[in-house]
Design a protein with these regions (language model features):
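Short secondary-structure boundary segments
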Residues: 2, 25-26
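Bacterial N-terminal signal peptides that target proteins for export
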Residues: 2-12
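Short, linear, compositionally biased motifs with a strong N-terminal bias
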Residues: 15-17
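Exported/periplasmic ABC-transporter solute-binding proteins
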Residues: 26-144
Length: 144
């Protein structure tokens, strides 16, 4: 009987551990409709979000918008697009700020706040859960 309870507890812990991963939906990297571009590559997004470039290839200024640490969208974006953990990102920006080479992207609280800022500012680029994308923004990159 004890063995069966241990198995059930172990299974419950496993399911709780995996549930955030299973709940992560597709993401969309979005831009203001007036931004002069139709798509971005993963490498371009990487460079923008790590502050390595502040302008698109056509010369347009770009302002990356991040989400708060701990959000599912942020975790998926950094894992799948930037290929870095929250710890690695924090260390990266600490180094960059300390050496005076830049500042991290501005942060918004959630998907909706990111989308609202992108709609209001023609230079903003953000990532959101694909389910909230509508015709007020354009998708320039998709993450499955």
């Amino acid at each position: 009987m004890v063995n069966k309870r241990q198995k059930i507890k172990s299974l419950a812990v496993l399911m709780l551990t995996l549930s955030p991963c299973l709940a992560m939906a597709d993401l969309a990297v979005i831009a203001n409709k007036e931004m002069p571009l139709t798509s971005l590559s993963q490498e371009e997004i990487y460079r923008i979000y790590l502050g390595k470039t502040k302008f698109l290839s056509n010369g347009a200024k770009v302002i990356p918008v991040d989400q708060r640490v701990g959000s599912n969208s942020r975790a998926k974006f950094y894992a799948d697009v930037i290929k870095k953990s929250d710890t690695e990102i924090k260390a990266y920006w600490s180094r960059v700020i300390f050496t005076g080479q830049g500042y991290p992207p501005i942060q918004e609280s959630d998907d909706r706040a990111v989308k609202d800022l992108v709609v209001k500012n023609k230079n903003c680029l953000g990532y959101v859960d694909r389910s909230i994308v509508d015709d007020s923004v354009k998708v320039v990159f998709s993450v499955s």
